Amino acid sequence: KGIAEDIAKAALQSGAPGPTVTFGEGGGVRDKIPLLRITKGPEKEFVWCVVEKADADGVFGDMARAGKITEPGRGFMYSIPVHTGLINVSSTVSSSAHGANMEQIIPALDDLKGGKDWRTNPETNKSNSIKSTFLKNLIGLYCIVPRDFYGDVYDAILDNGAPGVSTNFGVMLDTDSSESDQQQNEEWALVYTSVGPNDVDSLREAVSEKITALGIDRFAFYTLPIPRALTYLGG
């Protein structure tokens, strides 16, 4: 906690349209040590940012450097694909006067130049890409449960081998429910982690068994691909 402002500022300076900062809880290996598991993980800051594909590498690198993500205890950073959406809405309302946009032009130049080295700033001779070892092809496993039960799901994820876990809270609108104030104000938790593709099914089954044993009848799982992630790897 305490570095979200620096990361968000770096995203803005890299051209990202409005990063969002949210708050929740998170934990990792230290939570598996019994003497340290007095309370749930400390409060965490989450910085979310949606950018065009052509800008993703540069923005990712600038955010990672600002947050010093590859240093011990500095958090976990990852990207997920967004297939449809609108960003910079004010600039996309009217039709473009050109036959192609920058998202099409930049990848085309990458192909022509045989890579991304041409993007190097000639004045500083530095590329926007970050020099580090990425974790690749992970899967994000997300579980939605009523907030009262999030601690059990949080523990189950860590107890079954996940390297870390994060939690966000919010109110979910259910179109099939009545309009009672109690249901409208009911808080839910989104508890999630990232693991290798071979571990997704076993982890989901283990957490499902825990949820069933608790008698929870309202919950949901979903997964998202994580093409790359960055954190401290030790050594």
Regions found by a protein language model. Name each.
Residues 1-235:
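Positively charged, small/polar-rich N-terminal and surface patches that mediate targeting and assembly
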